[in-house]
Amino acid sequence: MNECKYYDVVNDLLKFVLCELKEKNISISHFKIQKAIFKIKMELGQNHPLFDYLPFYWSEHGPFSDVVSKQFIELKNNNCIQYSSHTVFLDDKSFNDFSQVNKLIDEYPIINSISDGIFEDSNLFFNKFDEDIYLDYAPFSFMHPFKYVLYETTIDDELFSSLVSDNYLNVFYDCLSDLPHDKLLVDFSVLFSRLFSRLELINDENQFLNNWGYIIQPVQLSWLTFARWVRIHNHDGFYNDDIGSWKNELEKFIREDSP
C-alpha cells in the first residue's frame, strides 16, 4: 500500500474528529482521541476500504497509532491545537479551515454517524470509555483487569482507598494464570510469578497495605513489560518493520527494568 495514503486518511479523519470535538465543546486527551479513532476504525469493520489505512498497535495506553501521533504533532507544530490540563482542543481559525471541506467524510458519511455515537456518550469523559475499549477489543481478556485493577490501583488514590488485598491478589493470580505461552515472555513470566509469591507472603503477614509503597513500582513495570510484548504480537501490518526493534526493546526492558 502507498504509505502516503495512510497519512492522508489519518490526517483527514483526525481533522474531522478535532472539528467534531470543537463543535460539541469537548476537550479530551490525545490518548482518548487515539481510542476514539480506533473505535471508528473498528466500527467501520474489516471489510471497509479505510480499515487497513488506520494502522494501530496495542501499547500500555491501549490502542495507539504512530501515524495518528505524527499527524497530531504536525498540527501542534502548526499551532492548530492547544493544550489545557492534558486535554487538547482545536483553535478557532483551524476549525474554520478544517470544517469547510473534508473529502474523506464526504466519501464515507457513515463516519459521521459513528462519531456521533462516540462523542455523545457521556462515558467519553470517564474511564468507562477506555475500559470498554479494552473489554470490546483487547487481544486478551485479562488485559482489562491487569490494566484497570492491578495497574490503575497504583496510580489512582480512589481505587487504592477501596483496595482489599485478597481481591487484588485473586486478580493478580488470574492474570498470571492467563499469561500467553511465548518464548519472548518466558523470563517475564518467571519474574511475574516471583512477584506474586512475594505479595502473597506479605499479605499472609498482614503487611500488604503497609508495604504498598514498595509494591507500586514492580506492578507498574509488570504492566509496561507485558504491554511491550502485546505490541509485538498485536499490531497492524503497517508496523511489521518495527518488530525487530520492538523485540530488542522488550528484551532490554525485561533484563533491566522488570520487577
Identify the function of each model-found stretch:
Residues 1-259:
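Domain-edge interaction signal
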